[in-house]
Swiss-Prot record:
Glycans are attached at N411. Residues 368-595 are annotated as: Interaction with TOR1A. Residues 1-351 are nuclear. It comes from Mus musculus. This is Torsin-1A-interacting protein 1. The lineage of its organism: Eukaryota, Metazoa, Chordata, Craniata, Vertebrata. Keywords: Coiled coil, Glycoprotein, Isopeptide bond, Membrane, Nucleus, Phosphoprotein, Transmembrane, Transmembrane helix, Ubl conjugation. Expressed in the spinal cord and liver (at protein level). The gene is Tor1aip1. The keyword Ubl conjugation applies. Residues 24-38, 70-101, 115-132, 251-262 have a biased composition (Basic and acidic residues). The modification Phosphoserine is found at S60, S134, S140, S151, S153, S154, S155, S241, S244, S255, S328. GO terms for biological process: nuclear membrane organization; positive regulation of ATP-dependent activity; protein localization to nuclear envelope. Belongs to the TOR1AIP family. It is a single-pass membrane protein. Pfam families: LAP1_C, LAP1_N.
Amino acid sequence: MAGERWQAEGPGEGWAIYVTPRAPIREGRRRLDPRNGDSSDAPAYGAHPSRRGRREVRFSEEPAEVYGDFEPRAAKERSPGGRRTPPEKFRPASAGEEVRESAYNLRSRPRRQRRAQEAEEMKTRRSARLEQHSQQPQLSPATSGRGLRDSPSSSEDREEDEPSSRPVTSQTASKKTLRTPEASVMNEDPISNLCRPPLRSPRLDSTYQTNGNTKTNEREATIVQQVNFFEEGETEDDLESSYSDITIRARSSDSLESRDEATPAAGNHPDSLRGLPHNQDFPAHENQPLLLTSGCQENPQEWVDRAVRMRSRMAYNNIQKSNFGNQSPSTSRPQSAIHHPNEPSVKIKWWLLGLVAILAVGLFWFFHTPAVETTAVQEFQNQMKQLQSKYQSQNEKLWKRGTTFLEKHLNSSLPRPQPAILLLTAAQDAAEVLKCLSEQIADAYSSFRSVRAIRIDGAGKAAQDSDLVKHEVDQELTDGFKNGQNAAVVHRFESLPAGSTLIFYKYCDHENAAFKDVALVLTVLLEEKTLEASLGLKEIEEKVRDFLKVKFTSSSTASSYNHMDPDKLNGLWSRISHLVLPVQPENTLKAGSCL
């Protein structure tokens, strides 16, 4: 049978006597080829007759010792004599065996009994190594709790009685030695390196499951290997030479997977993995000294202190890493936002600062300009009150309507929509009052700027050429307004040449005027000797219009672009007649002087 041991060969065969051959292939009943579409386990049609069909393999709960269709691993190792041992041939099955199915269960082989000489030699080496380390002081419970799983005496009994079918020893039976620096770093106890790990229930180990995780098994098998197994005939030199040929895999091939994969392994080996970080591996290098060897050369007390420090440092690092791993992304994002300021926030702050500056300038301009205008209006009102106190014979409508009209123009927003045009008229008895009052009203308008109003005398230009007068009037008004003067007075408007008056289209054309922030005061002296005070403003306006029409238009004057005609006069009148106010004579006014 597959589980029975074959008889040993001659003494020269070496390890071949301990090789368990693969179970023989038993032939059952032959099956017909699936020619008609039926499915069976028979070989395909046309296959070679010597090729047997596939077998169904069922795995038992015990670890498997048969490795499929290849040779046993022990058969590939070299024998002590230096030659390779050929694999054993399987003996034929007896005729009386009953072939039930083309399936069988894989069973672990029974442990072999050591020969007396071999067991005595291994005990001698082990006892010598135990005596070498028995002089070291006893470790603290915290130190020995992780490293010493069993006492040295129990480890011997466990090594003798433990089945050889453990996954760790069965997978590495062909190795000369297994010296793991990782186990030394984790346990840091020289005595624990001589102790075999405790027996584990084969039902709880995922290595024995057919659908188990091979990555976890590989990690477990690597970490559990803490004992140095010495084969027959090897020496200490062989151990040191074979140390450089072994690479310990402390983690699975895919170590970047989630930590949940490493948690079950840590549960199976709590003493081995508790102090080891998940993402830390310890590859064994050729020049790296063993912790056990260095510990034997140093003082035992120093070695114990170093082991305690290394263990506490590894535990502290593991706590830090676990805390960082358990931190949620929502907690880590605000920290990164604190260390690294957000650039859009800085830009928004700069934009806000610029906006505040613009608003400050706008508010300053908004509040400053009305304050200036308010001061100008107040100054104008004060001047008009003084004039009203001086010229007491004037009609109340003159002060009320004139002050309101010019004050409204001063309060209008900048730029103002149109200039302020005021026309004053009087009879022959109030000629001196008309001249003085018109100039003082214009000066009151520009009193805030402390400048004198522009003065143009029409009576002095009556005999001059119309074009020349027009040019002179235009030049005086333009220069004065450009130089900061905002008021002008034109005396004796009716005395100007008729054609020259067309220049006032430029300065009085409402929204199309050349200068809109100015005030013009025009005076017209009627031919009548006295002007009745009972006349209304409408009647006075008609009197002035009819007088200018007679003055500027005549049938003998040729019609041309530079000569006045009724149509042009009507257009000019509509532009200069915004407000027409009468002026009455003053008894206190002396000739040649103003009040």
